[in-house]
């Protein structure tokens, strides 16, 4: 018996732990399985999470164990989405949880507080919402908690674990005050509360955090003053509270913090003096105090004992006055000094040459005088020298040309005179040169033609003369050229057309003449062309219509003639068009109404005639419309009132007739209206009194107006001259009383009563007529229905003739031997061969299913393989119309679209389309496979070629006046050479009866995640909606993120922008692109691709580029042998 009891206890000792271990392991497996079931896993990252594996769960991806218990979960950047399961509380031994950079949503589960052994939690850059759970206080071992970049809200909980060392809740929407209880986190080393909506003051109790090294409070709504107690944080290394509303002075004690390296307090309301202690700290290297209201810097009694390591000092845009602080020149460690936008006066001290490590010196927008001291040449490392907006004088020093490290030299808005020194030729690294608004003279400085790195050149507002040299084309990197306000003469050199990077060209207010060279129409990126105030002649350049990026055109005050080109209507991004003071004739082209971004249209003082086109009402953003001093006639179109943004309307000195439209009362933003010197008649509409009090100028003089001036209008406009020249006009402010107004009023009243009586009688007679008509119609329909019923009964024996009609139709579409044949553009294939090749349209041969039917793989006996699309039964398009549309569609050919090779149309309602077979599937499958193989199958060059191929194909469709309507990865197919082909285009033509193609029903506007916002709202597809869809596909190619992975509040576009704003560029990289070197050209090309994607997905359709622009940008994004030319748009040879 004793032996049995002993054996029993031995059994318990040996097997009880094993049973306990098995139970705990199973509980952890169950918890992780529940966690997985909550998630969407597009990359299949959790496929290894199988309970049947030998060491489950310790051999699962991302799961770490210690002594067979789960202690770590690491699943970053795997595109996981869904809620974090409450069952995670079953992992009682968990020490580290890392789910960062995914798409988790919902709230942080309260049950996480049961994982009491947690040391670190990384949940940053997800889409989590709600509040921080108060139960977090139970995580008594927690050291790191990072939830940055989510959508968390509410107040910061008071009871956070006192064990915390790193707390980052930045980039959320937390509100309320910073809790003083944070002072209890005595082990805290990093506290990041930036980019939230926190209010109130910074609690002084934070000064108790002796271990705190990093305190970031930027971009909140904090007020009050900086607490002096923060100076007790003796371990503080980085203190940043920029972009708040903090005021008062900076405590001098901050300068005594022994380890402080960075102090950033810019964009606040600080005032008073800057304490000198900040410049006497050996550890402090960066001080940023710009955009405040400081009035002075405390001047030291002596700097003998002052040692500092300061490298960056930013005091820009304050109110500091007096002479430049001489003692600053003793801070020999300075690399960046910015005191621009202050009130400094006097001369620049020669001692500034002591700062030999200086790389950036910005003294712009002060009141400095004198000459540039020669000692500055001792600062040999300077790459930015900005003295713009002062009162410096003398000649530009020759020695500046020998400071070869200079990249930015800005001396504009001073009083420099003389010539540009020839030594400038040595500044080969110079990128920006601003010498505008000085008194420089001579001819165009030819020395500048050697500065091939220049991207911006401003010589405006000087006294240069002579011709603009042809050699200006040497500046091939130039994007901004401003030569306005000089005395240049001669013609614009045609070589300017070679400056392909030019975005702004300003040659205004000169003595230039001749015609505008046609080469200017070949500048692909130009947005601004300003040629006003010269003597240019010839016709208005029609070639400008091809400059799709053009936003501002000013050709006023020249001698241009001819008509306004109708093709200007293609300039959809045009914001301002000014052609005033020329000799332009003809009529105003109604096509201008297509320039939907137009805000300013100035055509004054020309020879325009004809009517004012009502199409101008289609300009919703129009603010200034000036058509004065022309020969326009006809009535003022009342539709102009639809341009509700209009604030200035000038139609004076024309031959306009008719009345002033009463609808003008809807122009609530109008401040000026000039209708003087015309032939307008009638009264001034009383409704114009409804125009807001913003109206300060109203001129209707010299017309044929009559009646009383509306009282409220007359009291607001007191100048009699603005109503003069209208002999029958009376009332204020004119000195003419409206004496007959009472009698006329009675006459009008009697006339009104008579009209009301007549209208009532007419309405009664009309209602009688309608009743009689309806009665007659109903009686006629009843009789017709009886006749048709009788006829049907008589014809019923003939119903079987339908079969004979089908057979007859079949014989007409057969070959000579009677077998139906497919219409092929390059080959002969019979229907029987096709049915056999698809195995009777067997389910196993289905390649894809869309709303346009099934796509089958067809294997013919001769080895040829094609794709056959069978359109849905019941197609409403009749046979003849289907054939006509298919013939047209078969002529649409390009190397990057799936070309229609043939078709079949015959009874019973069978419609087939023949395409080349694409053996390498579609883009959606390819991206999914790439993610499973860590992306190595899709490197950067291949992704770029795919994107470029799609862009070329879509661009060709748009040039062919076709809109796709459903651009998505599933509709991008790949041939044997992995060339991209766009499929499923033009099929609406073959399935919709209506000849109108402009309106598309809501179920055909595209695919969720890829369809543009405006297409979703309007139900209409356009080129712009295609471009938006392409942008989404491009971002998916580059980032590997599928649009459907995101929540309703955040889409892929917002996600990409958020990562860029945070500087988290690596988060955008698809796993296969992680090997890109940030210093390589491929990295830059990738970023350019991202920018193209964001341009295509702009919220306003008018801000999106055309597909030809996209192709141009993508071709320029990667230049090399791996980018084939797009010059050959023809399709590739087909096996069919």
Swiss-Prot record:
GO terms for cellular component: plasma membrane; pollen tube. Disulfide bonds: none annotated. LRR repeats lie at residues 93-115, 117-139, 141-162, 163-186, 187-210, 211-233, 235-256, 259-280, 283-304, 309-330, 333-355, 357-379, 381-403, 405-426, 429-452, 453-479, 480-500, 501-524, 525-546, 549-571, 573-595, 597-620, 621-643, 645-666, 669-691, 694-716. The modification Phosphothreonine is found at residues 830, 838. It is a single-pass type I membrane protein. Keywords: ATP-binding, Cell membrane, Glycoprotein, Kinase, Leucine-rich repeat, Membrane, Nucleotide-binding, Phosphoprotein, Receptor, Repeat, Serine/threonine-protein kinase, Signal, Transferase, Transmembrane, Transmembrane helix. It catalyses: L-seryl-[protein] + ATP = O-phospho-L-seryl-[protein] + ADP + H(+); L-threonyl-[protein] + ATP = O-phospho-L-threonyl-[protein] + ADP + H(+). Gene3D superfamilies: Phosphorylase Kinase, domain 1, Ribonuclease Inhibitor, Transferase(Phosphotransferase) domain 1. GO terms for molecular function: ATP binding; kinase activity; protein serine kinase activity; protein serine/threonine kinase activity. Residues 773-1136 are cytoplasmic. Residues 786-819 are annotated as: Disordered. Its main location: membrane. It comes from the Eukaryota. The chain crosses the membrane at residues 752-772. Its EC number is 2.7.11.1. Residues 23-751 are extracellular. Pfam families: LRR_1, LRR_8, LRRNT_2, PK_Tyr_Ser-Thr. Glycans are attached at residues 105, 138, 184, 192, 232, 269, 281, 365, 441, 474, 477, 482, 511, 535, 554, 594, 631, 669, 679, 699, 719. Belongs to the protein kinase superfamily. Ser/Thr protein kinase family. This is Probable LRR receptor-like serine/threonine-protein kinase At4g36180.
């Amino acid at each position: 018996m004793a032996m049995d009891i002993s054996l029993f206890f031995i059994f318990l000792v040996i097997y009880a732990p094993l049973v306990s271990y098995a139970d705990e392991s199973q509980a952890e497996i169950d918890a992780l399985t529940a966690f997985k079931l909550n998630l969407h896993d597009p990359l299949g990252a959790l496929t290894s999470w199988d309970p049947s594996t030998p060491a489950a769960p310790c051999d699962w991806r991302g799961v770490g164990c210690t002594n067979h218990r789960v202690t770590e979960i690491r699943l970053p950047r795997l595109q996981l989405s869904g809620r974090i399961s409450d069952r995670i509380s079953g992992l009682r031994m968990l020490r580290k949880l890392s789910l960062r950079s995914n798409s988790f949503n919902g709230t942080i589960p309260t049950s996480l507080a049961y994982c009491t052994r947690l040391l670190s939690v990384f949940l940053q850059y997800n889409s989590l919402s709600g509040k921080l759970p108060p139960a977090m206080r139970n995580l008594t071992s927690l050291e790191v908690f990072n939830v940055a970049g989510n959508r968390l809200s509410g107040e910061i909980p008071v009871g956070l674990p006192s064990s915390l060392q790193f707390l980052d809740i930045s980039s959320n929407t937390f509100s309320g005050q910073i809790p003083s209880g944070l002072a209890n986190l005595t082990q805290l080393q990093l506290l990041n509360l930036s980019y939230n909506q926190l209010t109130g003051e910074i609690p002084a109790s934070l000064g108790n955090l002796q271990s705190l090294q990093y305190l970031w409070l930027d971009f909140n709504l904090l007020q009050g003053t900086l607490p002096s107690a923060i100076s007790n944080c003796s371990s503080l290394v980085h203190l940043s509270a920029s972009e708040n509303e903090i005021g008062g002075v900076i405590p001098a004690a901050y300068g005594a913090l022994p380890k402080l390296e960075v102090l950033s307090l810019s964009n606040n309301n600080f005032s008073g003096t800057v304490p000198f202690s900040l410049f006497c700290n050996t550890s402090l290297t960066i001080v940023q105090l710009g955009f405040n209201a400081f009035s002075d810097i405390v001047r030291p009694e002596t700097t003998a004992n002052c040692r500092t390591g300061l490298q960056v000092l930013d005091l820009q845009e304050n109110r500091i006055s007096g002479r430049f602080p001489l003692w600053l020149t003793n801070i020999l460690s300075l690399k960046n000094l910015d005191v621009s936008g202050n009130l400094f006066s006097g001369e620049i001290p020669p001692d500034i040459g002591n700062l030999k490590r200086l790389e950036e010196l910005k003294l712009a927008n002060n009141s400095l005088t004198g000459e540039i001291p020669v000692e500055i040449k001792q600062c040999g490392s300077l790459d930015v020298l900005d003295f713009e907006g002062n009162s410096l004088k003398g000649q530009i020093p020759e020695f500046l040309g020998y400071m070869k490290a200079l990249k930015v030299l800005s001396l504009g808005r001073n009083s420099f005179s003389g010539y540009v020194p020839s030594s400038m030729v040595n500044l080969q690294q110079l990128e920006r040169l601003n010498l505008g608004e000085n008194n420089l003279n001579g001819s165009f400085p030819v020395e500048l033609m050697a500065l091939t790195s220049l991207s911006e050149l401003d010589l405006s507002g000087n006294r240069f003369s002579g011709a603009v040299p042809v050699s200006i084309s040497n500046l091939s990197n130039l994007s901004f050229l401003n030569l306005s306000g000089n005395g240049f003469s001669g013609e614009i050199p045609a070589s300017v057309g070679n400056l392909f990077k030019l975005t702004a060209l300003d040659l205004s207010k000169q003595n230039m003449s001749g015609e505008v060279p046609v080469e200017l129409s070949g500048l692909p990126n130009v947005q601004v062309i300003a040629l006003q105030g010269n003597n240019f002649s010839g016709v208005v350049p029609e070639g400008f219509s091809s400059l799709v990026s053009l936003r501002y055109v000013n050709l006023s005050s020249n001698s241009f003639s001819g008509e306004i080109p109708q093709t200007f209507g293609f300039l959809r991004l045009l914001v301002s068009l000014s052609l005033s003071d020329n000799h332009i004739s003809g009529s105003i082209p109604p096509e201008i109404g297509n320039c939907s971004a137009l805000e300013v249209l100035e055509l004054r003082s020309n020879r325009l005639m004809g009517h004012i086109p009502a199409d101008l009402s289609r300009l919703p953003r129009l603010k200034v419309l000036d058509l004065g001093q022309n020969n326009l006639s006809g009535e003022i179109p009342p539709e102009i009132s639809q341009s509700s943004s209009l604030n200035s309307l000038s139609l004076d000195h024309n031959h306009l007739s008719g009345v002033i439209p009463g609808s003008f009362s809807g122009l609530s933003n109008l401040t000026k209206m000039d209708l003087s010197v015309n032939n307008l008649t009638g009264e001034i509409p009383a409704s114009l009194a409804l125009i807001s009090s913003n109206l300060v100028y109203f001129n209707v003089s010299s017309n044929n107006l009559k009646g009383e001036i509306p009282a409220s209008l007359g009291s607001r406009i007191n100048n009699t001259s603005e109503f003069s020249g209208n002999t029958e006009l009376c009332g204020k402010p004119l000195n003419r009383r409206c004496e007959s107004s009472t009698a006329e009023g009675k006459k009008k009243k009697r006339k009104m009563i008579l009209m009301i009586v007549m209208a009532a009688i007419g309405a009664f007679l009309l209602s009688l007529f309608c009743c009689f008509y309806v009665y007659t119609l109903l009686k006629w329909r009843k009789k017709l229905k009886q006749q048709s019923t009788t006829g049907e009964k008589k014809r019923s024996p003939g119903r079987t003739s339908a079969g004979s009609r089908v057979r007859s139709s079949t014989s007409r579409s057969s070959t000579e031997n009677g077998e139906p044949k497919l219409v092929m553009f390059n080959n002969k294939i019979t229907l029987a061969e096709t049915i056999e090749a698809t195995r009777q349209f067997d389910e196993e041969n289905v390649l894809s299913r869309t709303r346009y039917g099934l796509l089958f793989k067809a294997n013919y006996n001769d080895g040829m393989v094609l794709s056959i699309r069978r359109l849905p039964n019941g197609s409403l398009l009749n046979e003849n119309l289907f054939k006509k549309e298919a013939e047209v569609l078969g002529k649409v050919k390009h190397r990057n679209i799936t070309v229609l090779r043939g078709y079949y149309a015959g009874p019973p309602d069978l419609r087939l389309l023949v395409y080349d077979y694409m053996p390498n599937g579609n883009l959606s499958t390819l991206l999914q496979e790439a993610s499973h193989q860590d992306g190595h199958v899709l490197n950067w060059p291949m992704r770029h070629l795919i994107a470029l191929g799609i862009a070329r194909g879509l661009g060709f469709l748009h040039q062919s006046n076709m809109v796709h309507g459903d651009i998505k990865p599933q509709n991008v197919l790949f041939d044997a050479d992995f060339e991209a082909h766009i499929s499923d285009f033009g099929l609406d033509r073959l399935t919709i009866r209506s000849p109108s193609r402009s309106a598309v029903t809501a179920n055909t506007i595209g695919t969720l995640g890829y369809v543009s916002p405006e297409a979703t709202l309007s139900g209409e597809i356009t080129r712009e909606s295609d471009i938006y869809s392409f942008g989404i596909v491009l971002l998916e190619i580059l980032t590997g993120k599928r649009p459907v992975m995101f929540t309703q509040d955040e889409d892929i576009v917002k996600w990409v922008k958020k990562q860029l704003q945070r500087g988290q560029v690596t988060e955008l990289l698809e796993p296969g692109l992680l090997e890109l070197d940030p210093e390589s050209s491929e990295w830059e090309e990738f970023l350019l691709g991202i920018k193209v994607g964001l341009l295509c997905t702009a919220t306003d359709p008018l801000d999106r580029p055309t597909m030809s622009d996209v192709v141009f940008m993508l071709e320029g994004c990667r230049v090399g042998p791996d980018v084939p030319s797009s010059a050959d748009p023809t399709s590739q040879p087909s096996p069919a």
